[in-house]
Amino acid sequence: MKQSARAKDYIQNKFKGYTAEYYLYPDRGGSFGNVTLSRLPVDGKGKIKFEESANLAIYTDHNVGDRRFRVYNCHFESYNISLTGVIRAIARRDSTVMAETGTKMKRSITRRPEQVDQVFEDIENCPVESFVCGDFNDNPMSYTYFRMTRGRKDAFVEAGDGFGATYSLLWPMLRIDYVLYPERYRAISHDIPRVPYSDHYPVITEIEL
C-alpha cells in the first residue's frame, strides 16, 4: 500500500495541472498499473480488470463543448519473456528455459484475445464515442489490432510515417502501441520520439475534433 501511495503522490506532484486517473498496485518493489492524464475535467471513470492477470484497461469520460466521449487506456497481456535470455538459452541449448518460454507465450496468446474481447464488449455498450489507446502488445496483423480498429482509425496509418516502431528493444521491427479514434475525426500529426524513458517509445498524436 505504501508503494502505491508513493506512486500516486509522485504522479500528482509531477503532473500538476492535469487530472490524473489511475489504477496502481504494488509490484516487484515498485508500482504497476495504468494512468490517464487529462487537462479536461473527468466526468466519469472506470476500470476493466482482466481475470488472472496483472494487466487491465481503464477509461475516463470527458466533455468538449457539446460533445461527450470516452478514452480507453489499455494494457493487454505481454509475453513476459526476456529476448536476451531466450537467445542465451538457445546458445546453451537450455531446454528448461525454452520450455518455460513456450509456456509463457502460450499463456499470453490465450489470454490476450479474451482481454481484447472484454474491452471490445465494453466499447460496444458505451453510450458515447470512444478513443482507444495503449500498449496492445500485438502487431498490426493481429486479432487484437483487427478487433480494436473496428469503427476506428489508426493515427499512425493516417498521419504517421516510417515503420512506426514503438518497442525499443526490437526497433525498428515492432509497432505494438496505438492511438485509435472515431472515423469521423482526423489525425493532424503522429510522432514517436526515440527517448530512453522505457522499453517503449511514447506515441504522441494530435486529433482534430
Predicted regions and their residues:
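Membrane-embedded segments
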Residues: 1-64
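Soluble non-cytosolic domains of exported or imported proteins
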Residues: 2-5, 106-114, 170
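Active-site environment of divalent metal-dependent phosphoester hydrolases
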Residues: 2-6, 28-31, 54, 79, ...
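Extracytoplasmic/secreted proteins, especially bacterial periplasmic and envelope-associated proteins
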Residues: 6, 10, 32, 111-114, ...
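Loop/turn elements at helix/coil->beta-strand transitions in domains of secreted/extracellular proteins
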Residues: 18-19, 67-69, 126-129
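Beta-strand-turn-beta hairpins that frame and shape the catalytic cleft
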Residues: 38-43, 53-95, 185, 209
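Short glycine/proline- and acidic residue-enriched helix-loop micro-motifs
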Residues: 96-107
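Metal-dependent phosphoester-hydrolase catalytic domains
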Residues: 113, 120-130, 136-209
